[in-house]
Amino acid sequence: MSDSFNLPLRPLTEKRERPDPLPVEIAQINAQYGSFRDVTEDSLRAKIEADKNKDPWFDKEENDNASADEDTTERLDQLYKRRAAITQFALQAHMEAMFALDFVSLLLSKHTPRQAEMSMSAYLKQVAPLGSLNSEIVNPPPKPESAARDTKNVSRGWRLQNFNSAASKLLDSATRLEAEVASETRYWDEVLAVKEKGWKVSRLPRERQALGVQYGFLEATPIFRDRGLAALRRTNDGSLILDKGLIPLKARTVRVRVRSRGQITGCSKNQPASDNTESIESRILQARDTVYEEELFHELVREARILGSQGVTTRQNLVQFPVSEEQEVLLDLIDSDQISPENDVVSSNEHAVVADALAHAIRILLAYAHRQNLRRRTQLPTPLTPKRRQTPEYQLLRPVMAYLQHSSHVRWLESLLNDINQILKSAGITCDFTATPFSSLSLRRTISGLPKVEALVQEFLLPYESTFSAQLVTPQSSFRVKVRTNVTTPPLGTHYEISVNMPQYPDVRPPNRIGLQDEAASILTHFVLLDILTAITHAKGSSVKGIKQETGHLLTWQAAYPHNGELLALSSTGQHKKMKVSLSRHELTVRVYSIRGIDGFGKPAVDKTPAMRSQTWKCDGTPDQPNLMDFIAEVSKE
């Protein structure tokens, strides 16, 4: 390749062969200042100073002041005079134009009389015949050499000036083109970098000459799907800017808080901001996250409107639903840098993990809803009907509410059974309680045709079930409790299904479905109480859970009113006794009374004296406290 070389665009300027002639300069001085006798150095300096200090607006101001002093009448007369002058000038110009037209027409009538006659005036046709005027070419007199040289110099000057102008324009265009090339190169490099990172770049639907990046989710609702496309604009230096359109400038996020007993005890963590917030990648990610968070809160509000019967409330920018009597969850859409007011300050981080888990759960459920939309869209469409198909609300709040409510009921039931078990242990009775929380969940279950992620999420959309079982004091006595929570299909809420196996009371059957915790607690404690009464009636001469009882001179207890916890012991000496047994989650109490006999209604007549003996067992039993069977053996003596 040949070496590069510089090609100058501007013409080379040459010095004049000789200066301007002196007679020309003298003529210019005489025309400007007059005779040389009147031109002195002082007069020239005074003229220069006067030109420097002269105000260019002075004459205009004088004219304005003079015109302002004229009255209205003079201005009106002046207006009419100027109008007449303008009209006269127009008529004179028209007349001169007609004279010129007649002259040219008469001159052309020598050669083309028919065409020239059409442009002649009527007066000229009368006074001058056609072809009476002719023209000849006369050679001009030869110009002197000085005039030809001056014309040549002027032409050369004009050419030099035009060359300089063209060179300046070419250099400016080259500079502008170089800057434009650098700007375009930087723009396309950044566009290519955006595409290489996995973002979809395409033309805008309504602006075909511009490029856009698709950062939204195609399976979102139409209002948020259309907002997921932003234009990639180019600045003057070629860098990319993201035209977000309706997307807010600040990042927004859905905040989850847990309120317990009126205090905020947990708050979800905001997503940490990127280190390089000015990069196009961080701006695209911020726009994507903001659209996703706004769609998430929009769907939460839509779902909350149909869950009003389950305690879900919405007000302004807040969604609130209860978990238990003392705990509730708050969800709101805030700016990432928003500062919480004083009444919403987090008092502790007791439930911070729960808040973070809920925040992740609702986002995963929204992504699962997007996948379900894609699955429905790829399947065969349903037949067309005149009725418009409604878009169902996404299941975002309902699975979360079901999990929290079910977990709350499971913890309550575990606490109840543990308390009863501790009371029985303090009374010397051993029972086996077994708990299987969330027994319905099978994380290893696979569904044909579904990815593992969707199959895993689908497990949490089904009703939750937990199973509790217990082997009671007497052999073959047991109960089983199934806790079931469902917030998607009826029956809604949490229900307890209790099944009992008590051979001593075969007719005792619990209700099919129990919805209140107090009712479930009373039924379970009642069944345990019946089993304790059965153990007391079989205590003489037998062993209960490995405990040997004394057999000499002991009364035999019989269940008089077992559902009221009353036992009766009849003695041959007439010293009858009555036992009252009561059980709650806090204590087990046994009271023994002496009775005179049986009244006419078959009921024992209790003495009005206080109880002979009384014993209470609690969760934190004392070491010197006798167990239940020892106490029964002692009060059974005649």
From Swiss-Prot:
User: One of this protein's Pfam families, by short name?
Assistant: Med17
Q: Where in the cell is it found?
A: Nucleus
Cellular component terms (Gene Ontology): core mediator complex; mediator complex
Provide one Gene Ontology biological process annotation.
regulation of transcription by RNA polymerase II
- Keywords for the protein's UniProt record, in alphabetical order: Activator, Nucleus, Transcription, Transcription regulation
| GO terms assigned for molecular function | transcription coregulator activity
The answer to keyword Transcription applying to this record is yes
State if Transcription is listed as a keyword: yes
> Region Disordered: what ranges?
1-21
User: Which Gene3D superfamilies did the record assign?
Assistant: 6.10.250.2620
Report the protein's function.
Component of the Mediator complex, a coactivator involved in the regulated transcription of nearly all RNA polymerase II-dependent genes. Mediator functions as a bridge to convey information from gene-specific regulatory proteins to the basal RNA polymerase II transcription machinery. Mediator is recruited to promoters by direct interactions with regulatory proteins and serves as a scaffold for the assembly of a functional preinitiation complex with RNA polymerase II and the general transcription factors.
Question: Would you identify the family this protein belongs to, as annotated?
Answer: Belongs to the Mediator complex subunit 17 family.
Q: Which PANTHER family match?
A: MEDIATOR OF RNA POLYMERASE II TRANSCRIPTION SUBUNIT 17
Q: Tell me what this protein is called.
A: Mediator of RNA polymerase II transcription subunit 17
Q: Which organism is it from?
A: Aspergillus oryzae (strain ATCC 42149 / RIB 40)
The gene is srb4
